[in-house]
């Protein structure tokens, strides 16, 4: 109650000061604008509109006065009056965002959709931060019609194409998202990765692969089609910790193990992946994983090689193939556990079938659960020669 009274008293004082200013300087548009603002704050919109009109009569070329008049008229549901004011504001400040933004919004509410998006487009050209809200409005207006949205905005530069691409990816339109991404042509790697993560999060794996493979620079990395292709199955292309997509994903969160590329006794090629374990971590967390495209309904055989040295744990490591397309990541196959102690290279194979709705699988190197309590692991493991064949 006290704060409400203080606020009311402050508004009254502000209005009295503004009225005194207009009496002392009746030809000053700033004084009339100040009184119009005070009247608006006091809820006296009709009088505020008249005061804005007085200010504009004294300074007709000032676009911000027209914007404020338009807002005041809009608040009293005078759409035609608001339209006239915002049109004048845009005429006086054709390269400023706000006049076009306000004009576009009032046109939209009047049902003049084509004109509205022309103005919203001009606003976003002046201020890119307005584009996401404009796209949201278009999505609702055109009932998710991506083609109509593209026509409404007529994107002419990479940032606009990319903004539409990311929006479509997040709203279940992967093909249209990919079209916008292609139209953007060369974009910064950080933006490409952000778009890739949008596609991956929405499980648009085939489109994700195109975006990911388009950013590859490693000469030894598989590109062709991506279907049933293990990327760098023998670990010859180096270790990357920050490359989302279809290469090897290595966790940086755990302190209980470390990775290295070992040149001593690889199964094939020049390297194998060595993992040194020294403590406890969540067995369900993948130590290393890779997303692989597959053909829906097809059967596959996965091959890999592993060896161990002084391995001690209650939860032995295994390789698991899971359905990346499903909501629960259901398991499709699991390898035999790697042996305790020390062993030479051992080849393992496992077969699995992709479901009718499965177009990607996740190959993960994890551990079996210890059952209860802490689940430490110590020793060393080497992995090499991952490959996949269609049966």
Regions picked out by a protein language model, each given a short descriptive name:
Residues 1-16, 20:
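Hydrophobic alpha-helical transmembrane segments in integral membrane proteins
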Residues 29-30, 63-64, 79, 97-98, ...:
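Helix-start (N-cap) detector for alpha-helical repeat units in TPR-like alpha-solenoids
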Residues 129, 155-391:
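Extracellular and organelle-lumenal recognition/adhesion modules and their flexible linkers in secreted
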Residues 24, 58, 92, 126-127, ...:
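Structural marker of alpha-solenoid helical repeat scaffolds
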Residues 20-21, 54-55, 88-89, 122-123, ...:
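Canonical positions in the second alpha-helix
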């Amino acid at each position: 109650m006290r704060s409400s009274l203080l606020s009311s008293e402050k508004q009254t004082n502000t209005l009295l000061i503004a009225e005194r200013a207009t009496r002392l300087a009746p030809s000053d548009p700033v004084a009339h604008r100040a009184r119009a603002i005070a009247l608006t704050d006091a809820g006296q919109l009709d009088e505020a509109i008249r005061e804005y009109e007085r200010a504009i009569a004294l300074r007709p070329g000032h676009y911000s006065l027209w914007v404020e008049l338009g807002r005041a008229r809009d608040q009293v549901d005078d759409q035609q009056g608001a339209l006239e004011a915002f049109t004048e504001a845009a005429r006086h400040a054709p390269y400023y965002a706000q006049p076009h933004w306000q004009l576009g919004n009032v046109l939209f509410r009047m049902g003049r959709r084509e004109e509205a998006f022309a103005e919203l487009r001009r606003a976003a050209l002046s201020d890119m931060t307005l584009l996401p809200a404009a796209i949201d409005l278009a999505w609702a207006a055109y009932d998710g019609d991506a083609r109509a949205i593209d026509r409404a905005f007529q994107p002419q530069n990479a940032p606009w194409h990319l903004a539409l691409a990311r929006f479509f990816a997040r709203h279940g339109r992967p093909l249209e998202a990919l079209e916008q991404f292609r139209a953007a042509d060369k974009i910064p790697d950080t933006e490409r990765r952000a778009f890739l993560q949008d596609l991956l999060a929405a499980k648009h794996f085939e489109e994700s692969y195109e975006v990911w493979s388009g950013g590859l620079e490693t000469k030894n990395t598989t590109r062709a089609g991506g279907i049933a292709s293990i990327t760098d199955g023998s670990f010859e292309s180096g270790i990357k910790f920050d490359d989302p997509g279809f290469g090897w994903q290595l966790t940086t969160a755990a302190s209980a193990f470390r990775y290295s590329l070992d040149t001593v006794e690889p199964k094939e090629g020049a390297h194998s992946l060595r993992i040194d374990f020294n403590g406890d971590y969540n067995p369900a967390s993948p130590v290393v994983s890779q997303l692989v495209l597959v053909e829906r309904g097809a059967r596959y055989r996965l091959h890999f090689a592993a060896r161990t040295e002084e391995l001690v744990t209650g939860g032995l490591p295994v390789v698991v193939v899971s359905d990346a397309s499903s909501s629960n990541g259901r398991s499709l196959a699991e390898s035999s556990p790697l042996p305790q102690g020390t062993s030479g290279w051992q080849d393992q194979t496992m077969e699995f079938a992709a479901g009718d709705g499965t177009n990607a699988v996740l190959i993960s190197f994890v551990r079996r659960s210890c059952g209860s309590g802490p689940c430490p692991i110590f020793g060393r493991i080497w992995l090499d020669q991952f490959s996949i064949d269609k049966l």
